[in-house]
């Protein structure tokens, strides 16, 4: 496929505000693609070269990209940087430069072979792999070779891709729906395969080649989508939901981790499927010593501890571990302990279809506790008073509360169901709990906040429609540093119109691709005619909103937008808070 054909589809996807139109455009594109190029097309649409756990990054900032455009067009870098300062879009700079800069003669241009998708992808992969002395010059040379042969529209999307600002915001589920339509494959089957092996490029090629989805199995070294929990505010409600008996585990305030042991090496993946092994070499070493298996996939929580007292520290302390440099110093200042709570695979045996009580038994057989690896404290209960006692014990020891699970439940990858239920201490507040919401828009700041965003439009996620619905406008709780950080985080996501996956009655000054997730608390959840969250769920024509929302200071960089608080959860929180007596 010629890259120009892909660029036309990207332009159409970018301009639409209708998700159904987006699916139709992608379906048509996939039908035309060859099996050997469809994976590259999918990766490009997602803005990635490879799946997240492989950690392949282009390492190209705007200035380097502008150097490449300058080399290809003969326009000065200074002039191009001036254009960039005005537009803020390196893609627009590339489009304009290719339209205005020196071009081949008409004859030479006619004889020039059009760019192919595979050629663009392979060149970008070379850019990503360029390292060591002279790497920057090599990156510029490779990129300029693409720009010199690209049309203005092609150059726009190549430039945006290389700086990580493609701005399409196409969701994984949208791509799955389009693949299902294009190849006549069950959408549910594709979703199941994606949960087991969440590499959409590989999945697209698999179905394009006509291979059965049953071939895709859980594989050590490839993270699966984690199972997620619902929430309730009382032990009696939790037990009723779980059929009268629950396995309750401490809910540690740390970083959820999926640990893969394979051929003597350990990989640690975040809930966003990124390889974070570099941040926890001590944990990886401890896993090798503690896990008595050749191959295994385990789940747990990495918790920071005080090196002097051994007491658990808040989740935020683990952020010191994320720096690529000074890891040794961070390990000493912020030691970490791993608390394991599930075993998904061991030595050729897929345990995800086995009941939790069996997985727990196998976990205790496989793990030799000690050092920095432990099994999360748990118990099995059938009485609300016993659950509450265990809950208070957990909170007093510095945890967030409990995760209560059905003893007979299988491991449902990527699902948020009622087999796992959170019971957290935050449920004692009026609003019952904090919520994690997605930033979809912003309002310009005034006075001290001039030049930045003064407030943000936040939305909850509805997995049944794959859409985001607004629930509040928040401007409280942000420090000056927070406002600057939010501005810098959101600028690359700025788009000229409401995103097709966002439903909003409010009109902010600026719209964004839904990607940034932040934690918010409020006084209560109220009925609102201004917001679209859960319209009609409680009262006809009226949605839900958070009253007096406030940013807690916690950026949920560990969560994808699809991991945000759901609209269904907000309805349940609204209904439960009615039972809390006011004082």
From Swiss-Prot:
Q: Where is the active site?
A: 251 (n6-amp-lysine intermediate)
InterPro entries, A to Z: ATP-dep_DNA_ligase (IPR050191), DNA_ligae_ATP-dep_bac/arc (IPR022865), DNA_ligase_ATP-dep (IPR000977), DNA_ligase_ATP-dep_C (IPR012309), DNA_ligase_ATP-dep_cent (IPR012310), DNA_ligase_ATP-dep_CS (IPR016059), DNA_ligase_ATP-dep_N (IPR012308), DNA_ligase_N_sf (IPR036599)
> Which keywords describe this protein according to UniProt?
ATP-binding, Cell cycle, Cell division, DNA damage, DNA recombination, DNA repair, DNA replication, Ligase, Magnesium, Metal-binding, Nucleotide-binding
Catalyses which reaction(s): ATP + (deoxyribonucleotide)n-3'-hydroxyl + 5'-phospho-(deoxyribonucleotide)m = (deoxyribonucleotide)n+m + AMP + diphosphate
Q: Which Pfam families match?
A: DNA_ligase_A_C, DNA_ligase_A_M, DNA_ligase_A_N
Q: Which SUPFAM superfamilies match?
A: ATP-dependent DNA ligase DNA-binding domain, DNA ligase/mRNA capping enzyme, catalytic domain, Nucleic acid-binding proteins
Q: Which domain of life is it from?
A: Archaea
What's a BP term from Gene Ontology annotated to this protein? DNA recombination
Annotated GO molecular function terms are:
ATP binding; DNA binding; DNA ligase (ATP) activity; metal ion binding
Q: What is its EC number?
A: 6.5.1.1
Cite the binding residues for ATP: 249, 256, 271, 301, 341, 416, 422
Explain the purpose of this protein: DNA ligase that seals nicks in double-stranded DNA during DNA replication, DNA recombination and DNA repair.
NCBIfam families, per database record: dnl1
Name the family. Answer: Belongs to the ATP-dependent DNA ligase family.
- Name the UniProt record assigns to this protein: DNA ligase
Source organism of the structure = Pyrobaculum calidifontis (strain DSM 21063 / JCM 11548 / VA1)
Q: What gene is it encoded by?
A: lig
């Amino acid at each position: 496929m010629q890259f120009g054909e892909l660029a036309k589809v990207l332009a159409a996807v970018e301009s639409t505000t209708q998700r159904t139109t987006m699916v139709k455009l992608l379906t048509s594109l996939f039908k035309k693609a060859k099996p050997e190029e469809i994976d590259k097309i999918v990766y490009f649409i997602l803005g990635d070269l490879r799946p997240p756990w492989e950690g392949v990054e282009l390492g190209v900032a705007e200035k380097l990209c502008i150097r490449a455009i300058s080399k290809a067009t003969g326009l000065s870098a200074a002039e191009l940087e001036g254009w960039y300062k005005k537009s803020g879009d390196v893609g627009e700079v590339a489009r304009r430069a290719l339209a205005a800069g020196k071009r081949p003669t008409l004859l030479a241009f006619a004889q020039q072979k059009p760019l192919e998708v595979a050629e663009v992808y392979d060149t970008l992969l070379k850019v990503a792999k360029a390292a060591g002395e002279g790497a920057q010059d090599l990156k510029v040379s490779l990129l300029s070779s693409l720009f010199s042969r690209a049309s203005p529209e092609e150059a726009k999307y190549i430039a945006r891709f290389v700086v990580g600002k493609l701005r399409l915001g196409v969701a994984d589920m949208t791509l799955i729906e389009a693949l299902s339509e294009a190849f006549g494959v069950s959408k549910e089957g594709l979703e199941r395969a994606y949960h087991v092996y969440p590499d959409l490029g590989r999945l697209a090629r698999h179905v394009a080649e006509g291979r059965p989805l049953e071939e895709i199995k859980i594989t050590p070294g490839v993270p699966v989508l984690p199972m997620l929990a619902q929430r309730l505010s009382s032990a009696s409600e939790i037990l009723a939901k779980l059929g009268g008996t629950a396995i309750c585990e401490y809910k540690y305030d740390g970083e959820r981790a999926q640990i893969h042991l394979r051929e003597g090496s350990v990989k640690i993946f975040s809930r966003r499927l990124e390889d974070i092994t570099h941040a926890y070499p001590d944990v990886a070493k401890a896993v090798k010593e503690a896990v008595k298996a050749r191959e295994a996939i385990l789940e747990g929580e990495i918790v920071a501890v005080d090196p002097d007292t051994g007491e658990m520290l808040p989740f935020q302390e683990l952020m010191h571990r994320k720096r690529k440099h000074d890891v040794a110093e961070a390990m000493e200042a912020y030691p970490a302990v791993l608390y394991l709570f599930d075993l998904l695979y061991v030595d050729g045996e897929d345990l995800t279809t086995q009941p939790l009580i069996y997985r727990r038994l196998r976990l205790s057989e496989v793990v030799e506790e000690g050092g920095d690896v432990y099994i999360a404290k748990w118990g099995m209960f059938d009485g609300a008073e016993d659950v509450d006692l265990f809950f208070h014990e957990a909170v007093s020891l510095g945890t967030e509360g409990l995760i209560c699970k059905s003893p007979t439940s299988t491991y449902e990858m990527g699902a948020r169901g009622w087999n796992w239920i959170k019971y957290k201490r935050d449920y004692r507040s009026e609003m019952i709990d904090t919520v994690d919401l997605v930033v979809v828009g912003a309002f310009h700041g005034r006075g001290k906040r001039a030049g930045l965003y003064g407030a943000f439009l936040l939305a909850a996620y509805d997995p049944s429609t794959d859409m985001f619905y607004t629930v509040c406008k928040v401007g409280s709780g942000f420090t000056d540093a927070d406002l600057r950080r939010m501005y810098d985080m959101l600028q690359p996501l700025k788009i000229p119109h409401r995103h097709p996956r966002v439903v909003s009655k409010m009109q902010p000054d600026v719209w964004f691709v839904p990607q940034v997730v932040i934690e918010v608390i409020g006084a209560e959840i109220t009925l609102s005619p201004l917001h679209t969250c859960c319209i009609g769920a409680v009262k006809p024509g009226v949605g839900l909103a958070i009253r007096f929302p406030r940013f807690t200071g916690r950026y949920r960089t560990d969560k994808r937008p699809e991991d945000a608080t759901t609209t269904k959860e907000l309805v349940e929180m609204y209904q439960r808070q009615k039972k809390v007596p006011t004082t």
